[in-house]
Swiss-Prot record:
The keyword Cell wall biogenesis/degradation does not apply. InterPro entries: ATP_syn_F0_a_bact/chloroplast (IPR045082), ATP_synth_F0_asu (IPR000568), ATP_synth_F0_asu_AS (IPR023011), F0_ATP_A_sf (IPR035908). It comes from the Bacteria. It is a multi-pass membrane protein. This is ATP synthase subunit a. The keyword Metal-binding does not apply.
Length: 248
């Protein structure tokens, strides 16, 4: 009988559901997500400040890396929004890409266990649905801001075209597109961290390394997908449902 009812495996030591909550007046916020997000933002700001404190006409080192990253983000915005309209949206698209990219990589590389908490454990900000849904809702807001800034209140006419019967569907579509991004990002990053945690418990020396390298690649791809599609939605709002010339 002991063969069938032996002690549970080490994987049972993985605990989920424990969170650090902060109570601010009547509001309860997820402390782990805020701390991890602040760490990601601090890393980004540190690299940017170090790379731009002594700008040179011929960039080298960290400045060269920052300029390459800026050109890469500009290419995303230009391709999805269009040559005429992309420049005002580069900061937003760049912020999305950098925050998601750094957050995803932190989930695989950052030694979270070295930062003790009263409850729970730190993890990548993007493995929490609150973060990804917040980013998606922010993209929805930018979508409406782009449309209204371009066409004024006449922007809302598109919701009753070609017939007012489609009003609920058109409204729902504009909210479900960015929300689908949030669930994709959340699911991928959460699954990656759980797989790595299980492998580290089972085979702590060899197997997790190539898996972590693979997840670093997929984390970068997820950041690219989220920022690219967010830029595409903004370009759609600027040019209308017909697509316009946002691929100039």
């Amino acid at each position: 009988m002991n063969l069938f009812f032996s002690a549970p495996p080490l994987v049972a030591e993985l605990e989920v559901g424990h969170h650090l909550y902060w109570h601010l007046g009547k509001f309860t916020v997820h402390g782990q997500v805020l701390i991890a997000s602040w760490i990601a933002i601090a890393l980004i700001l540190t690299v940017v400040l170090l790379g731009t404190r002594q700008l040179q006409r011929e960039p080298a080192g960290l400045q060269n890396f920052i300029e390459y990253t800026l050109e890469f983000v500009q290419s995303i915005a230009r391709a999805q929004i269009g040559e005429k309209n992309f420049r005002p949206w580069v900061p937003y698209v760049g912020t999305l890409f950098l925050f998601i990219f750094v957050s995803n990589w932190m989930g695989n590389l950052f030694p979270w266990k070295l930062i003790p908490l009263p409850e729970g454990e730190l993890a990548s900000p993007t493995n929490d649905i609150n973060t990804t849904a917040g980013l998606a809702l922010l993209t929805s807001v930018m979508y409406f801001v782009a449309g209204i800034s371009k066409r004024g209140l006449s922007y809302f006419k598109k919701y009753i075209e070609p017939t007012p019967v489609l009003l609920p569907i058109n409204v729902l579509e504009d909210f479900t597109k960015p929300l689908s991004l949030s669930f994709r990002l959340f699911g991928n990053i959460l699954a990656e961290e759980l797989v790595i945690a299980v492998l580290v418990l089972l085979v702590p020396l060899l197997i997790p390394v190539p898996v972590m390298i693979l997840f670093l690649f997929t984390g970068a791809i997820q950041a690219l997908i989220f920022s690219t599609l967010s830029a595409a939605y903004i370009g759609e709002a600027l040019e209308g449902h017909g697509g316009g010339d946002h691929h100039d």
